[in-house]
Amino acid sequence: NNALRLVHQFFRKSDGGPLPESEKRILENVQQVVNDVLSNKDVMYNLVEVKSYDDYTYFHSVNVGILAGIIGMKCKLDRATIEDLVTAAFLHDIGKIFIDIEIIHAPRRLNDQERIRMMEHPRLGYELLEKNFRFPESVNRTVLEHHEWYNGLGYPNHRGGNDLLFTSRVLKAADVYDAMTSKRPYHPPYLPSEVMEYIMGRSGMEFDPAIVEVMSRSMCVYPVGCEVELSN
């Protein structure tokens, strides 16, 4: 399935073969975190809301949750922070339920008016979670900040660098990676190597260099079918 594909890409197993034991342990830990997060009825409620509105956004949110958890593990974040990160990743696009479905499914690039409306979804999601649920503020803020750029040129509040939560910076990278490697109405899926080239090329601008470094050491940056020898 798509989530398994992401895992093998991350650990450079382009052939889909068994993962190394060290990486299996990371994946097992992430699975435990995911299970714990999904046991929260408020998380499940919001995921069901997303799925009932748009299937792609739902599956994208699940993929990003798994991917963000793996990156968080690789960044050696503590368990509580990873739980907050995965929770925010599952919920990061909840604000899209307030965006017209015609905009969500537009088979083309959005016009200026549509793009401005779409850019409201982080704030809309943050406000929904703040008003109606009791998630930690770090979760809500990570949802709010997931389209901010490291250099401060993102949205909605033009924050950058250490003014952003580290979890927001991880989520930003995981979100872009899954979106670009997924088939969309307006573009085919890019190869993992192409996406990593894009992310590495925007290190220090769109993405936190420390997170890019972790991803570049871990993710598949070689064409599908190319065998890579893992270093000890």
Predicted feature residues:
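Histidine- and acidic-residue-rich, metal-dependent catalytic cores
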Residues: 3-232
